[in-house]
Regions:
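N-terminal phosphate/diphosphate-binding loop that engages ATP/GTP or pyrophosphate donors
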Residues: 20-79
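Walker A (P-loop) phosphate-binding loop of P-loop NTPases
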Residues: 11
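Conserved lysine of the Walker
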Residues: 14
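Phosphate-binding/switch loop-helix module in NTP-utilizing enzymes
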Residues: 74-101
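C-terminal accessory "lid"/substrate-recognition subdomains
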Residues: 27, 73, 91, 126-214
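The Walker A (P-loop) glycine that initiates the GxxxxGKT/S ATP-binding motif of P-loop NTPases
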Residues: 8
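Conserved C-terminal guanine-recognition region of P-loop GTPase G domains, centered on the G4
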Residues: 95-134
Length: 214
């Protein structure tokens, strides 16, 4: 599974960018999942008066609405993005909004000031409204996904290539192996290697074992 984030201020073209990328990746034969991060405290899919809301109010911690055309699983809490990704098995998962995931990102903006405020080392390209005004922003390409989505998809494939190869990582807590999706395995592997590769005794390809007693 490969993960890419599309982030930026509201009304700068995030959703348009995401939908165009979805269409192009599907055209290329990939399966695609998405996660929409919503920074609005009052947001809730469920609402007072519904039967599922009554279930939650009665104390149910997980409620499922099983309909003819869709199934909605409702949890009364915000989940960590790594936990959310465990539910996905698609080739690509696109995160709309800054969920805090450690993955390549596309930054949208309407102005260069927008870009400067949200720029991070994760960003591999710029898109959104500003793509009608610029070709490059510093070292980064600016791509209009309404006109050049193929170029953006090529870049995404290249930037997420390492995620495709599942890292050989095993995590145990009190002797119990903890299941992790490939994205989380690769993230954990990169963090550990980044921390120890400057130490004496480190050799690329060698097994690394860490034990932490909490």
């Amino acid at each position: 599974m490969r993960v890419i984030m599309v982030k930026g201020f509201s009304k700068t073209g995030k959703t348009t960018t995401v939908t165009q990328i979805i269409k192009e990746l599907r055209r290329r034969g990939y399966s695609v999942g998405t996660v929409k991060d919503i920074h609005y405290e009052k947001f809730a899919m469920d609402h007072p008066g519904t039967d599922t809301y009554k279930h939650t109010q009665a104390g149910a911690q997980r409620v499922t609405a099983l309909g003819e055309k869709e199934t909605d699983i409702l949890l009364s809490r915000r989940m960590d993005i790594d936990a959310v990704l465990k539910y996905y098995k698609e080739d690509f998962v696109i995160l709309e909004g800054d969920s805090g995931a450690d993955c390549p990102a596309i930054l949208t903006g309407a102005t260069e000031e927008d870009l400067a405020k949200r720029m991070t080392d994760q960003v591999i390209a710029v898109s959104g409204i500003i793509s009608g005004k610029l070709d490059h922003y510093g070292r980064l390409p600016v791509i209009n996904c309404l006109e050049e989505v193929e170029k953006m998809a090529d870049l995404i494939e290249k930037a997420t290539e390492e995620q495709k190869q599942e890292a050989d990582v095993i995590l145990t807590i009190d002797g119990v192996e903890i299941p992790m999706v490939p994205f989380v395995k690769n993230t954990l592997k990169n963090v550990v290697i980044g921390a120890v590769k400057a130490l004496d005794g480190y050799e690329e390809g060698k097994e690394i074992a860490i034990r932490v007693k909490g």
